[in-house]
């Protein structure tokens, strides 16, 4: 094919859609031209390889889900606890009607392929796993890597990490604690840090059934407030763009 034909085949015009672009203050009916995967200006009469009628639809950048459990040990546990979720009415898994899709299954805890397909149908292009254990990071990344279409990343959990709590309990200097946070982010290939019931998950191992914000951990004698403040300061000094992701105290 000649160069002109290749340009034609790689070009798309999205017509009649409501274009929303908050970054540039755009909220109007407008056509969008695409060539080689990039938005370009097309002449209204220019021939294109494909035209999409987006009447009644919103045209905008892909959605980003900052908190979605899509990888790691908790997903496998959910699938084990929901065997009935893998099949509809106990029938074999139906083959997808879309020729671009491979067979997958699940609704409450879907397989990786189904996760990517369902997100794409909703207009999302990125999702982030917010609860990755450092020891489980390799598995979490491999599972997310098997999820099609979606860009992905994860936040590593440190609020009840035993070594982190030990450093606080021993009164180690802040630079040492900060460096441990930075090392954990790097080693686990995380994009940020999350705490879930800070200190409380560890405290439960010592039969401490609740841990309020200013209540001391039964073993390590540190409080959730200290944990949160230390991690927030560490992330700020490390220059991590995403702030500390917090799941509050005594929540399920």
Where is each model-derived feature located?
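Histidine/acidic residue-rich metal-binding segments in metalloenzymes
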Residues: 172-197, 201-252
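Short, Lys/Arg-enriched N-terminal segments with co-localized hydrophobic residues
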Residues: 1-8
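Active-site mouth loops of central-metabolism enzymes
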Residues: 89-111, 158-178, 221
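Mid-domain alpha/beta scaffold segments of enzyme catalytic cores
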Residues: 133-180
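Histidine-rich, glycine-flanked metal-binding segment
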Residues: 9-12, 19-61, 77
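Active-site beta-loop-alpha junctions enriched in small/polar residues
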Residues: 69-71, 132, 157-161, 196-200, ...
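Metal-associated gating/positioning segment near the N- to mid-region
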Residues: 57-143
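Hydrophobic faces of well-ordered beta-strands that scaffold small-molecule active sites
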Residues: 62-66, 127-129, 152-156, 191-195, ...
């Amino acid at each position: 094919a000649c160069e002109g034909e290749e340009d034609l085949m790689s070009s798309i015009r999205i017509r009649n859609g409501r274009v929303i672009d908050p970054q540039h203050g755009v909220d109007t009916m407008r056509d969008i031209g695409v060539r080689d995967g990039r938005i370009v200006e097309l002449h209204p009469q220019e021939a294109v390889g494909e035209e999409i009628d987006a009447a009644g639809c919103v045209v905008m950048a892909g959605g980003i889900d900052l908190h979605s459990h899509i990888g790691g040990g908790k997903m496998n546990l959910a699938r084990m606890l929901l065997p009935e979720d893998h099949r509809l009415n106990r029938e074999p898994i139906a083959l997808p009607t879309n020729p671009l899709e491979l067979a997958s299954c699940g609704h409450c805890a879907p397989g990786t392929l189904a996760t990517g397909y369902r997100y794409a149908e909703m207009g999302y292009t990125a999702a982030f796993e917010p609860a990755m254990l450092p020891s489980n990071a390799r598995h979490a990344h491999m599972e997310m890597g098997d999820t099609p279409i979606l860009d992905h990343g994860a936040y590593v959990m440190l609020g009840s990490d035993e070594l982190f709590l030990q450093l606080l309990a021993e009164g180690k200097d802040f630079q040492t604690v900060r460096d441990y946070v930075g090392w954990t982010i790097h080693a686990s290939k995380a994009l940020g840090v999350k705490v879930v019931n800070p200190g409380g998950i560890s405290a439960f191992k010592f039969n401490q059934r609740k841990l309020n914000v200013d209540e001391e951990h039964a073993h390590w004698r540190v409080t959730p407030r200290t944990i949160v403040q230390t991690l927030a300061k560490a992330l700020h000094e490390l220059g991590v763009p995403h702030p500390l992701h917090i799941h509050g105290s005594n929540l399920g």
